[in-house]
């Protein structure tokens, strides 16, 4: 009933008229959870394959992602949702933008999800609240709170150390703490990223830096 299995047995309960499934020679397992994804990138699979991470991001992914329309994001998310369902996943944790359109795909597919907009520092912008990432995150937070819906949850996204700075990181941590939200971030994907962070921040690794600015004072998912 709703999103709950209410009965497992060998006989149909008297008077029950809802859905039933034949479980002979099968096993019932909890759904898998994809802990880190960028579901609209399903459309870009294989694009720029073989490039080092930072060239792949700056030469291929970031420029292409910037051109994705709302419809692109929705249908790519629907394709990704089909792949999740086929593989036994019931929920996923995502970092992207145009959150409303990913949310629509989540609802239309019947999945669950945690959604976040991974903020990156931009010239001319100061605090986190000046960013589109904040506006989308806060709008989704308010909408979900009003709906009382637990199928979709919102997290606060920080793209990575190398696309951020200390002030923005602290702002993200403060907002997550004030709003009672989780943080979703990329931790340390490559040796290059790791070593350059130490050079920029007086020997601190990405993990140590994130801890210092308070990002690990709230529940956090640190992806690769």
Report residues per predicted region.
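Histidine-rich, glycine-flanked metal-binding segment
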Residues: 1-29
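Divalent metal-coordination and catalytic microenvironments
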Residues: 3, 25, 36, 44, ...
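Hydrophobic "anchor" residues on beta-strands that sit immediately upstream
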Residues: 18, 32, 90, 182, ...
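Hydrophobic/aromatic beta-strand patches that form the interior of the parallel beta-sheet core
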Residues: 19-21, 33, 114
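N-terminal capping/lid subdomain adjacent to the active-site entrance of alpha/beta enzymes
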Residues: 29-32, 37, 85, 89-91
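Histidine-centered catalytic micro-motifs
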Residues: 31-42, 182-191
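Alpha-helical scaffold segments that flank or form the walls of functional sites
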Residues: 45-111, 134-147
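Metal-coordinating catalytic core of metallo-dependent amide/deamination hydrolases
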Residues: 102-223
């Amino acid at each position: 009933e709703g999103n709950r299995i209410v009965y497992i047995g060998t006989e149909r309960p008297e008077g029950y008229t809802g859905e039933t499934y034949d479980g002979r020679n099968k096993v019932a397992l909890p759904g898998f959870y994809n802990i880190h994804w960028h579901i609209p990138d399903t459309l870009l699979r294989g694009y720029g394959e073989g490039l080092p991470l930072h060239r792949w991001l700056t030469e291929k992914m970031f420029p292409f992602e910037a051109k994705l329309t709302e419809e692109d994001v929705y249908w790519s998310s629907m394709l990704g949702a089909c792949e999740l369902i086929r593989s036994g996943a019931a929920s996923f944790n995502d970092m992207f933008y145009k959150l409303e359109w990913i949310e629509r795909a989540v609802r239309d597919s019947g999945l669950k999800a945690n959604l976040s907009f991974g903020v990156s520092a931009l010239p001319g912008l100061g605090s986190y609240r000046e960013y589109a990432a904040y506006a989308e995150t806060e709008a989704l937070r308010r909408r979900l709170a009003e709906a009382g819906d637990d199928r979709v949850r919102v997290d606060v996204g920080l793209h990575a150390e190398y696309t951020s700075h200390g002030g923005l990181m602290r702002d993200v941590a403060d907002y997550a703490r004030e709003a009672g939200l989780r943080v979703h971030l990329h931790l340390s994907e490559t040796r290059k990223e790791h070593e350059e962070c130490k050079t920029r921040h007086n020997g601190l690794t990405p993990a140590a830096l994130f801890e210092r600015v308070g990002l690990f004072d709230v529940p956090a998912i640190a992806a690769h």
